[in-house]
Amino acid sequence: MATIFDPIKLGDIELKNRIIMAPLTRCRADAGRVPNALMAEYYVQRASAGLILSEATSVTPMGVGYPDTPGIWSNDQVRGWSNVTKAIHGAGGKIFLQLWHVGRISHPSYLNGELPVAPSAIQPKGHVSLVRPLADYPTPRALETAEIADIIDAYRVGAENAKAAGFDGVEIHGANGYLLDQFLQSSTNQRTDNYGGSLENRARLLLEVTDAAIEVWGAGRVGVHLAPRADSHDMGDENRLETFSYVARELGKRGIAFICSREKEGEDSIGPQLKQAFGGPYIANERFTKDSANAWLAEGKADAVAFGVPFIANPDLPARLKADAPLNEPHPETFYGKGPVGYIDYPVM
């Protein structure tokens, strides 16, 4: 039976193992949200992953919500990412760019004084990440129906720029309470147009963005990231199994490369149902160990497993897992911020 160390084909991509590096925001980009040499070194250190899913990368300046996260809308950003992908490919790795719009999870200080946008003008609970002094999230501005085409186009251009930058494919960030998730889940979408109300309407934007990426890349080089638990950024849905199963089925009809779901083990996990509904390669994510990951593969609950924090602290994670070697302890105080400390200085075996 397959283990996480065995190769797999996800869509059009052949992977050397099933150990996926999960998307991890690290806030190390240069001015203008341009990827830099430090980021290239960080990813190269982790090129032994079967596939790297890049940190979330904004498709438009109005889609940012954190300091020093990268973008993919400018020529300078494309050039910066090109250096990253060349280095990763030189080290034998493969990488998809995660395309991102934060929606309401932002603040005017990141948006040139503008309000964040969202499906509906519903203020999220909580404080803006990494802004001091602490500031509540503002009430966002509801997007006009006519503006939604521009959002889809921003994702399309982001997908085109990702191709120009040399990525192996793209992953649509539809998780964790960001814009596409806000449209999808019932608690954050009170629209009465074609993008709200029914489940089909709430899922429309995510699927139209996915279709735009498919037009650029082909379905075999597009993945989608989901988070059915709704445990980030004040989310919630009236029937998460129905909602996310519908999305999985629709994505399955499109034949995309994979879905990756932040849906950890547990009696309430709907990961196996999503895999069945999707019918294609399913990447499980969150708090998996070597043993639990292999168990999910053996039980047919997943086809690959994405690791997040373990990859932060262990650049050589696949080798450590295979050797049953001890793992480095992560240092959360350096997860976000400038410089190499806690970024490229974790030891390898």
Could you say what each language-model-derived stretch is?
Residues 1-349:
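Flavin-dependent oxidoreductase catalytic cores
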